[in-house]
Design a protein with these regions (language model features):
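Catalytic glycan-binding domains that act on GlcNAc-containing polysaccharides
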Residues: 51-202
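N-terminal secretory targeting signals
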Residues: 1-75, 80-85, 202
Length: 202
């Protein structure tokens, strides 16, 4: 996950084991390299951010702008989510989770496209779960083992919080932050994929 500057704050993260469908299997195969030997770091600051943000309520900052954004992004998301009502609900949640952590919603969309192709049941070969492919160990790290990472809202909160944390830690160096998020620090293949996708969403 690499790219230009992105601001501060933090929010959700992690992945737990769940339904592995044929679609998940095909997707997982293509992402095996990205998830090989993940090296995701845990620290007290990130734990606290997750705890602070996991309970936050979702809301748009500007209703008119949000609705205009939803309509624009809906057309772009159609290739992944056919049903228009489901598409708008999903976009609303993504926009809200991104804004709560002061992330650009289009960047979060790019991460999701690369991570799961918008399949919130996706499970990677190493167990990363949900739409933002969060690792299940994060639940224990913040003392919330009961959290369901397949739940869309929960997964977005975890994922956005983690991504924001790594952006702050890397002082806005998006490529580095994305590599840390993906557990592939030192390799920029994953970051390049996300940044290419980001260009399409912006």
């Amino acid at each position: 996950m690499r790219g230009p500057g992105v601001k501060k704050t933090a929010f959700s993260v992690l992945v737990a084991l769940w339904m592995a469908s044929a679609t998940n299997a095909a997707w997982a195969q293509s992402n095996t390299l990205a998830y090989a030997e993940p090296t995701i770091e845990v620290d007290d600051q990130l734990r606290q951010k997750l705890l602070d943000n996991i309970r936050a309520a979702d809301s748009f900052q500007d209703r008119f702008d949000a609705e205009a954004w939803l309509m624009l992004m809906s057309g772009r998301l159609e290739r992944y989510v056919r049903d228009p009502d489901r598409r708008l609900r999903l976009l609303r949640k993504i926009h809200s989770a991104a804004r709560q952590t002061d992330l650009q919603p289009e960047l979060v969309l790019a991460v999701i496209e690369v991570e799961s192709h918008f399949n919130h049941y996706a499970v990677s070969p190493v167990g990363a779960q949900g739409i933002m492919q969060v690792m299940p160990f994060w639940k224990n790290e913040i003392g919330r083992p009961e959290d369901n990472l397949i739940d869309l809202d929960t997964n977005l909160r975890y994922g956005c919080t983690i991504l924001k944390h790594y952006l702050e830690r890397s002082e806005g160096r998006l490529a580095e932050a994305l590599a840390r998020y993906n557990g592939s620090y030192g390799s920029y293949r994953y970051a390049a994929k996300v940044m290419d996708a980001w260009e399409r969403w912006r």
